Amino acid sequence: MRISLKWLRELVDFELSPEELAEALTLVGFEVEEIEDRRSWAEGVVLGRILAAEPHPNADKLRVCQVDLGSEQPATIVCGAANARAGLLVPVATPGTHLPAVNLTIAKAEKRGVLSEGMICSLAELGLERASEGIHEFPPDLDLKAHPLGSDARPLLGLDDVVLDLTSTANRADALSMVGIAREVAALTRNPLRLPPVQPLQAKPIPNFNLRIADAKACPAYSGVLIEGVKVGPSPDWLKHRLAAAGMRSINNVVDVTNLILLEWGQPLHAFDWDRLLQVMGKKKPTIEVRFAQAGETLKTLDGQTRTLHPESHLIVAGGQPVALAGVMGGEETEVSSATTSIFLEAALFDPVVTRRSARSQGLRTEASARYERGVNFATLDLARDRAVQLILELAGGSVVGLTTFDQRPPLERTLKLRLSRLIDVLGEEVRPEDVEEILPALGFQLSRCQAVAPEAPPLPATETAGVAGCVWQVSVPPYRLRDVEREIDLIEEFARLYGYDRFSETLPTEPQVGSLSARETLTRQIREVMRGIGLTEVYHISLCPAEEDSSLVKIANPLSPEYSAVRKALLPGLVEAFRFNWDQGNGPLQAFEIGHVFAYAPPSSPEPYQEAEHLGGILGGDLNPNDWRHHSRPMDWFEAKGLLVSALERLGFTSEFRPDPPEAQSPLLHPGRQAGIWIEGSRIGLFGQLHPRLCQEKDLPEEVYGFEVDLDPLLASLEKRGLVQFSPFSPFPASDRDIAFFAPLELSVADIEKVIRQAAGPLLQSVQLFDEYRGQGVPPGQRSLAFRLVYRAPDRTLTDAEVEAAQNQVRAQLEKHFPVTLRS
């Protein structure tokens, strides 16, 4: 944004030099990249009048001019411009003047035998145009009392100005305007702000006219003013100079006014030729519609290009025909020209995301789209429109016929709570309440003290006492800051900017502190080490995924692409894809694990719409003896894969159980008959199983691939509660083993049987293991024969047969009590 200091001084008084102002603005967040002192472009250039212009005696293309510079004797100047003639008021560079635009220092010199005492300048030589056809001509009716001959010509050229080229952060759309920067300067200097006077527009609805807004989110507000009887022509010099300082060229008085309002208020406007709009509409009822493009539509924009429109292109449509890219660029067919007598002035609000997509779909970026993409202030729409109408009537004449409006803007009010204690906690500085009550009102915020603490803010420390530290304000956000000031922390940032970041002292810790990892990070690293210890390689995947047809996935509101339109709900799908990729590349089976976050919609009872959890996932399987001439190929079986997971949990200190899951808890990625829930300490923490055969077939994977996924939160919570691991010495006494066999129903799980055996056998039982399963001849229908080996051992003595038999009999009794089993031994 280019800021004219001459224009800025009309809005707010300040005594800072350009360099001091640039430093002050930089410190409050508006970095000044360049200071352009336009005064140096024409220092020494004065106003002159050509009294006579005679042909040069020795050159056909030169003229010898006598120029009145306000002194007793006219100056003789040799000029080569074809438009040099008597009576012209012109800029004259006197001897000693340096013109940076052409890197020329003026001196008296003979030109073809005639002494020339200066140079009559063109705008190109003054740096105001790229190329000029002749010398510049000031208006013949110039007030010579206000600007006598020989006086400084820079005010007449708009070169009595300094321009600051500054950048603002993306959230400060209000700063892309002169009024926005003037507010900042007023706050910095504590001087009052002088806004341009605006006469509120009073107009009736446009007769026999329709306005249609297809999507109120894409266009929350639209206003159009019909003005008849305008006379399009050149703009006055003051308007041209303001546009030139901002890097814009003058078009005509109507278009220049719309550009001036864009610079002054940050509100883009567009003027349509009303008669041309009616021609486009034909015999249809005059209708302006705001909608997205349809297939096959085209538009010839003001830059002369005929553009094929895309579904993302947001349009202004007249009678069904596109006439402008909304918020980006107008159409050539309805542009304002010297023949225009009636205009339709558009002032609207367009959604930032919609405008960005629309502009990018056509490869365009304009001053208007740049502002819409950041978010034009809701509150300035009516002010900017009325100011534009006022200037058009003043500079181009005409009268207002009518006004059409559509307005679904959100409420232009917001109230926040600000706690002094929170401000001090964030900034680390003892700030007085008086400082807050001086700085925030200077930025336009209204404050009133209260004692209630903001409910959405973190609670105050228990040690905090009432009084100054407990001071709380209710803050009303000005309408022009609604887009970027939404929370208490935003108010703290606003205070810090104006208070001055350079005023905060550097405070070193009073005592040296040893850095350490958090308990959660320490335990997570321990889990990583254990997983690497069982032979798995850690992998990472992006949390984004395609939404596809899965309604349970949490969707991204503004996705980068369809491939990244949702966030993952599990780690296992990504691990399967990683296994497939490595398998396809000939890298062999991937044995890997991943620790990452997963996301899901929260249950209706939860106050939050979404929930996030950290999971541990893994994938393993394939041939255990690849390319080994000594052994035959041997795929990993279910028990080997399960054993690796069990050993990992045991190294972490957990005794795990694997129980059948109900259908609703099963994963569709796993074999329905070869998956189980993982339980520790009475809670289900995840699942384990073999990949579904259909999935392996679709992805051309080996059948023997296994996956698991575990919720880390219960694991970490349990690990964090534990103290030091207590070592139990090995028993030096011999063990006694007993076998037990029985018929059991097929639906009875081994895990449930083992659980009852351990409870019945008591502390003497060291281990229990299934060593035989048989189905077939001799076994009752619907049952199977199971055989378990129980090992008994005491830490302090050799067990007697009586003790072992007593425990074994208790096991038999409890099995018959809990299950419909038939004992065989």
Swiss-Prot record:
Record-annotated FDX-ACB domain positions: 731-824
GO molecular function: ATP binding; magnesium ion binding; phenylalanine-tRNA ligase activity; tRNA binding
Domain (tRNA-binding) ranges: 39-154
Quaternary structure annotation from Swiss-Prot or TrEMBL: Tetramer of two alpha and two beta subunits.
InterPro entries, per the entry: aa-tRNA-synth_II/BPL/LPL, B3/B4_tRNA-bd, DNA-bd_dom_put_sf, Fdx_antiC-bd, Fdx_antiC-bd_sf, NA-bd_OB-fold, Phe-tRNA-ligase_IIc_bsu, Phe-tRNA-ligase_IIc_bsu_bact
Keyword Transmembrane among UniProt keywords: no
Gene3D superfamilies found in the cross-reference section: 3.30.56.10, Bira Bifunctional Protein, Domain 2 (3.30.930.10), Ferrodoxin-fold anticodon-binding domain (3.30.70.380), Nucleic acid-binding proteins (2.40.50.140), Phenylalanyl-trna Synthetase, Chain B, domain 3 (3.50.40.10)
UniProt catalytic activity: tRNA(Phe) + L-phenylalanine + ATP = L-phenylalanyl-tRNA(Phe) + AMP + diphosphate + H(+)
Record bears the keyword Secreted: no
Protein name: Phenylalanine--tRNA ligase beta subunit
Domain B5: residue ranges: 411-506
Organism of origin: Synechococcus sp. (strain JA-3-3Ab) (Cyanobacteria bacterium Yellowstone A-Prime)
Family under the similarity heading: Belongs to the phenylalanyl-tRNA synthetase beta subunit family. Type 1 subfamily.
Positions bound to Mg(2+): 484, 490, 493-494
GO-annotated cellular components: phenylalanine-tRNA ligase complex
Superkingdom, natural source: Bacteria
Record SMART domains: B3_4, B5, FDX-ACB
Keyword line: Aminoacyl-tRNA synthetase, ATP-binding, Cytoplasm, Ligase, Magnesium, Metal-binding, Nucleotide-binding, Protein biosynthesis, RNA-binding, tRNA-binding
Cofactor(s), by name: Mg(2+)
Top-tier EC class: ligase
Record's cofactor remark: Binds 2 magnesium ions per tetramer.
Compartments reported by the entry: Cytoplasm
GO BP: any one term: phenylalanyl-tRNA aminoacylation
CDD domains given in the database record: PheRS_beta_core, tRNA_bind_bactPheRS
Entry's EC annotation: 6.1.1.20
